[in-house]
Swiss-Prot record:
Protein name, UniProt field: Nodulation protein E
Lineage: Bacteria, Pseudomonadati, Pseudomonadota, Alphaproteobacteria, Hyphomicrobiales
Gene: nodE
Subcellular location(s) per record: Cell inner membrane
GO cellular component labels: plasma membrane
Keyword Cytoplasm: no
Superkingdom of origin organism: Bacteria
InterPro entries: Beta-ketoacyl_synthase (IPR000794), Ketoacyl_synth_AS (IPR018201), Ketoacyl_synth_C (IPR014031), Ketoacyl_synth_N (IPR014030), PKS_Beta-ketoAc_synthase_dom (IPR020841), Thiolase-like (IPR016039)
Regions crossing the membrane: 329-348
Function: Proposed to synthesize NOD factor fatty acyl chain. Involved in the synthesis of a highly unsaturated fatty acid moiety, which forms part of a lipo-oligosaccharide that is responsible for host specificity.
Length: 401
C-alpha cells in the first residue's frame, strides 16, 4: 500500500520561542538569539555561546510522569501536545492502535547522565537515582509521548545524530504508507547544553566563539542549542475524511550513507540522498524553490553541501533560494531537522523563505543564493537537508497540498 502523507499539525520549542508560531515569527524576521549560556554550570567553559530555552512553558504533565523524564523527553511531550492540538486529534479506545510516534534524538538523556556522574563522583552519593536508566535511554521521548497522549500504534525512537529528526519523520511516513498506522507523531528532541556535551564538542574544535554564520566566509563553526519539533502526519484519506486542514504534504524521502568517515563529510552521500528524495517525490530539480540547508557553519560542511547541491540541481542551484535556519535556532542536534521541518512547512504556508542570519562575507566556495539576512516572499515547494556525523543522511521534500 502506498498512501500520500500530509502534515496536519506542528509543534515546537527552542531558544527562539516556546511554540511553533513564535519560532516561525523569529525565523521569518531573521534575528539570531544566540548568546552566552547562563542556565547551566559550565565551569571552565564559562562564556560559551548557545541557544537555550530559558523558561519551560506551562504544561499539564502529571508529576508522576515528570519525575521519570529527562529534559529532552519533556521538550518532546510539550511539542507533541501542541502539534496534536493544532491537528484537532485525540486518542480513544477506537483509534489508539492506529496512532503512533517516531521520535528522533541525537543521543541519550544528557542531563540525566551528567547529574548522575556529578552526584556520584563529586558529591559522594553512593547510588544513582531510581529512574536514571529509563530517564536516560534514547527511546524515552517516544515512550513518554505515547504515555501522555495515549498512542498505542508503532512507537519507537530514532538515533542518527544530526539527521535524527528527518529520519524519524521518514520512518513515520513509511508506517503510514505501508498501512501500519493512520496517524504518526514524528520529529526530534534534544537537550545537549550540558558541560560534558559542550566539552566533547570543544574537543572537536568546531564550536564557534561568537555566533553561527553558515556559508559566510568568516564563519567559525557550530553553535549548539536545545529544543524539539514535532509534526502530526496523517494519510491523506484519513485527514480528508475528518475535514482536517492540511499544512503540507511530505512529498519525498531520500536516505543514504557516506561509508566514508565518522566525522568528515563527503559529497557523494548527500548527493545521493537529495537525488533519491527528488525521485521519490517525482520532482525535477527545477521544481524545488527553497532548500533548507544542513548549513552548520563549519568550513568543511558548508563547502561540501554547496558542492553537492550544485551536482544535484545543476544550473537551477543558482536560481533557487537556500538558507540555513541554524543561524537562528542553533544546531539542536536530534531536534535540528525537526525544527527545520517547521521552517519548510511555514514557508509553504506563508510564501516566505526564512533567511540565513549573521551572514557577512561572500565565500567563493559557497556561491549559492543563501538568502542573506533578509526573508524573501516567494511561493515555494521545499526540501530539507540533514547530514549527520557518521555519514547518515536524510532529505525530505515538502509541497503544498
Amino acid at each position: 500500500m502506498d498512501r500520500r502523507v500530509v502534515i496536519t499539525g506542528i509543534g515546537g520549542l527552542c531558544g527562539l520561542g516556546t511554540n511553533a508560531a513564535s519560532i516561525w515569527k523569529e525565523m521569518r524576521e531573521g534575528p539570531s538569539a544566540i548568546s552566552p549560556i547562563i542556565t547551566t554550570d559550565l565551569y571552565d567553559l564559562e562564556g560559551t555561546v548557545g541557544l537555550e530555552i530559558k523558561a519551560i512553558p506551562e504544561h499539564d504533565i502529571p508529576r508522576k510522569q515528570l519525575v521519570s523524564m529527562d529534559r529532552f523527553s519533556l521538550l518532546a511531550v510539550i511539542a507533541a501536545t501542541e502539534a496534536m492540538k493544532q491537528a484537532g486529534l485525540s486518542c480513544d479506545e477506537q483509534n489508539a492502535h492506529r496512532f503512533g510516534a517516531a521520535m528522533g534524538l541525537g543521543g541519550p538523556g544528557w542531563d540525566t547522565i551528567e547529574e548522575t556522574y556529578r552526584s556520584i563522583l563529586l558529591d559522594g552519593v553512593t547510588r544513582a537515582r531510581i529512574f536514571t536508566a529509563p530517564k536516560g535511554m534514547p527511546s524515552a521521548a517516544a515512550g513518554h509521548v505515547s504515555i501522555f497522549l495515549g498512542l498505542r500504534g508503532p512507537v519507537f525512537g530514532v538515533t542518527s545524530a544530526c539527521a535524527a529528526g528527518n529520519h524519524a519523520i521518514a520512518s513515520a511516513v513509511d508506517q503510514i504508507r505501508l498501512g501500519r498506522a493512520d496517524v504518526m507523531l514524528a520529529g526530534g528532541s534534544d537537550a545537549p547544553l550540558t558541560w560534558g556535551v559542550l566539552k566533547s564538542w570543544e574537543a572537536l574544535r568546531v564550536l564557534a566563539p561568537d555566533t553561527c554564520r553558515p556559508f559566510s566566509a568568516d564563519r567559525k563553526g557550530v553553535v549548539l542549542g536545545e529544543g524539539a519539533g514535532m509534526a502530526v502526519l496523517e494519510s491523506y484519506e484519513h485527514a480528508a475524511a475528518r475535514g482536517a486542514t492540511m499544512l503540507a504534504e511530505v512529498a519525498g524521502i531520500g536516505l543514504s550513507g557516506d561509508a566514508y568517515d565518522i566525522v568528515m563529510p563527503s559529497i557523494e552521500g548527500p548527493e545521493a540522498a537529495m537525488r533519491s528524495c527528488l525521485a521519490d517525490a517525482e520532482l525535477n530539480p527545477d521544481d524545488v524553490d527553497y532548500l533548507n540547508a544542513h548549513g552548520t557553519g563549519t568550513v568543511a560542511n558548508d563547502e561540501m553541501e554547496t558542492a553537492a547541491i550544485k551536482r544535484v540541481f545543476g544550473d537551477h542551484a543558482f536560481q533557487m533560494s537556500v538558507s540555513s535556519t541554524k543561524s537562528m535556532h542553533a544546531h539542536c542536534l536530534g531536534a535540528a531537522s525537526a525544527l527545520e521541518m517547521i521552517a519548510c512547512v511555514m514557508a509553504i504556508q506563508e510564501g516566505v523563505i526564512p533567511p540565513t542570519a549573521n551572514y557577512r562575507e561572500p565565500d567563493p566556495q559557497c556561491d549559492l543564493d543563501v538568502t542573506p539576512n533578509v526573508p524573501r516572499e516567494q511561493r515555494c515547494g521545499s526540501m530539507s537537508n540533514a547530514f549527520a556525523m557518521g555519514g547518515t543522511n536524510a532529505v525530505l521534500a515538502f509541497r503544498q497540498v
